[in-house]
């Protein structure tokens, strides 16, 4: 976890909790290494921070097969589209939109490179980051029906939350060095 350790060290003091959580959530728990690192890569991609994604990819490549990483990146890409589309349908609340076919290609959901259940878990984590209630509910049902426990789902969402917070915290690092208005005036 050397690359993500470097990210942890780059986080500013206001993100101290995130620094500690980033180390904790990626330790072995209820998820397999493929699930843990797939969620980390997918949510780092969804957070759109190049530094964080590069670090997650570097550490994941040392732990899992390339197919897992490919699926994680595909989940981030497909969910970037689906989360917007299905969140709109949910938010507008009109039956007429719900009846319209999506007509959006999402073949990777059906044919992932590695595990179908793991791909759905990656999609669930990204959907949580992107705030799509419909997608979160749908993917949660699929992974639980596929044999994952609520503890595993919970662990995946904890990873997603911390990776997202790490991306935000990396952005804060540039502002932490900026003097406050009071300090500049004094």
From Swiss-Prot:
Keyword list, A-Z: Antioxidant, Disulfide bond, Oxidoreductase, Peroxidase, Redox-active center
Disulfide bridges in this chain: 132-135
Biological processes, Gene Ontology terms: cell redox homeostasis; response to oxidative stress
InterPro entries: AhpD, AhpD-like, AhpD_core, CMD-like
Keyword Oxidoreductase applies: yes
EC assignment: 1.11.1.28
Superkingdom to which the source organism belongs: Bacteria
Catalytic activity of the protein: N(6)-[(R)-dihydrolipoyl]-L-lysyl-[lipoyl-carrier protein] + a hydroperoxide = N(6)-[(R)-lipoyl]-L-lysyl-[lipoyl-carrier protein] + an alcohol + H2O
Family according to the record: Belongs to the AhpD family.
Record-given protein name: Alkyl hydroperoxide reductase AhpD
Organism encoding this protein: Anaeromyxobacter dehalogenans (strain 2CP-1 / ATCC BAA-258)
